[in-house]
Regions:
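Extended, low-polarity transmembrane helix blocks
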Residues: 1-84, 94-214
């Protein structure tokens, strides 16, 4: 069965996978808007330091590194987080550089999970989940795998950029898109009037020859 076709032989619609990407982008956009509020910036460093205080001794060095790195420039990192989340959200919604966006978002989500969320804190008393950022990373990985099998997204900026820029697929797709094949045209038989007919003289000669051989 050809790829992209359902069991009935009809091509699977493109909009469900694009709707998933856009819906997830809207969730990220809401989260990004909250990051631009003053409350996030004012409590940013307190959150990082609070996460460090509850970590076991074997992980203390990891959180000390991030606290020491960000503490002198906490406002810069707070704005950086808000900007990165905004860029990811916009790229998701419009479908821009999907392979690059998904890959960068996986790394960013894992970094948030390993710092601001303290690996979800499954080893701390009273922990009830492993954090949300790791779930975001899994969703981005799913979108990346889906793009590999589904190919170019019809409702995305990448779809049109790939037509204009020959190398754009390298940052938008996991593999080079296969050019669409032109539909095969059925062979139409020529009308009988156009089929060459033997000349009358040749037909007569053939008849005489057959009579002489008898």
């Amino acid at each position: 069965m050809a790829k992209g076709l359902v069991a009935s032989g009809r091509r699977a619609p493109a909009w469900p996978k694009d709707a998933l990407r856009i819906g997830f982008g809207i969730i990220w956009l809401i989260d990004a808007v909250l990051k631009w509020l003053p409350g996030f910036r004012s409590g940013y460093m307190d959150t990082i330091m609070g996460i460090r205080d509850g970590q076991p001794g074997g992980l203390r060095w990891w959180f000390d590194f991030w606290v020491n790195l960000q503490h002198p420039r906490a406002m810069f990192f707070a704005y950086l987080v808000a900007a990165v989340e905004t860029l990811i959200a916009v790229a998701l919604i419009i479908g821009f550089a999907r392979k690059l966006t998904y890959s960068a978002a996986i790394v960013f989500s894992l970094l948030i999970w390993a710092t601001a969320e303290g690996f979800g804190g499954p080893y701390t008393s009273g922990s009830s989940d492993i954090g949300t950022a790791i779930i975001y990373a899994v969703v981005f990985a799913g979108l990346l795998i889906l793009s590999y099998y589904a190919g170019p997204a019809r409702y995305s900026a990448d779809y049109y950029l790939e037509k204009k820029i020959s190398w754009w697929w390298r940052i938008a797709e996991l593999r080079r898109p296969v050019p669409a094949e032109a539909p095969a045209q059925a062979e139409i038989p020529a009308p009988a009037s156009l089929v060459p007919q033997p000349a009358d003289g040749a037909a007569a000669d053939g008849g005489v020859s057959r009579q002489l051989t008898k």
